[in-house]
Each structure stands twice: as C-alpha cells, then as structure tokens.
Amino acid sequence: MKKPFHHQAGFTLVEMMIVLMIISILLLVALPSMTKNNEVAGDKGCEATVKLLQTQVHAYEIDHDRLPTNLDALKREGYVEHTECPNGKKLTLRNGVVAISE
C-alpha cells in the first residue's frame, strides 16, 4: 500500500521578503563595526611594523657603525622584506627614527 502524499507548503513570497529584510538589517548593523575593527587592526599592524623597522635600524647601526640612509638600505641588506605598513601607509626614516608618513 502506498503512503498518501502530504503536501508541504513552502515559504510564501511575503515570508521570504521578511527574512531578506531581517538579514539586510543585521548586515547594516554588523558591517560598520567590522569595518572599524579592520581599521584598528591595520593601525596595530602599522605600529608593529614601525617597531620592527626601528629594531632593524639599530641592528644595521651595530653592524655597519652608521645609520642607514633610508629604509631601502635595510631591504637591500636583507634586514627586512617590506618597508611599508600592511594598511598601505608609507614609512620614512629620518635621523635613525622610523615614522609614518603623513
């Protein structure tokens, strides 16, 4: 004997619209905080890069008895691989001090 076919109703168009509206509202609330967190992470990454480069400037000075003329000298000599921040900000070296370019 066959089982009777039970008709299961799906979502109506109105129900789907309500679900999509709720998801959209949740995204509108969540996206700004995620964007802010990305900016904070980028700034922290830049601060860490500055500290790393400053340490390598001191190592260069110890090895060569003079300060490097620019950050590219650190890269050429193999002290670092990158001389810019992860968030794209440029860095400069003046009188042995690494700083973020304005």
UniProtKB/Swiss-Prot annotation:
The chain crosses the membrane at residues 11-31. It is a single-pass membrane protein. Gene3D superfamilies: Glycoprotein, Type 4 Pilin (3.30.700.10). The keyword Transferase does not apply. Pfam families: N_methyl. SUPFAM superfamilies: Pili subunits. Residues 9-34 are annotated as: May be involved in polymerization of ComGC. It is found in: Cell membrane; Cell surface; Fimbrium. Keywords: Cell membrane, Competence, Disulfide bond, Fimbrium, Membrane, Methylation, Transmembrane, Transmembrane helix, Transport. It comes from the Bacteria. InterPro entries: Bac_GSPG_pilin, ComGC, N_methyl_site, Pilin-like, T4P/T2SS_Core. Major component of the type IV-like pilus (T4P) that plays a role in transformation. Transformation pili are dynamically extended and retracted, perhaps thereby promoting DNA uptake and transformation. Required for transformation. Required for DNA binding. Belongs to the ComGC family. This is Competence protein ComGC. The lineage of its organism: Bacteria, Bacillati, Bacillota, Bacilli, Bacillales.
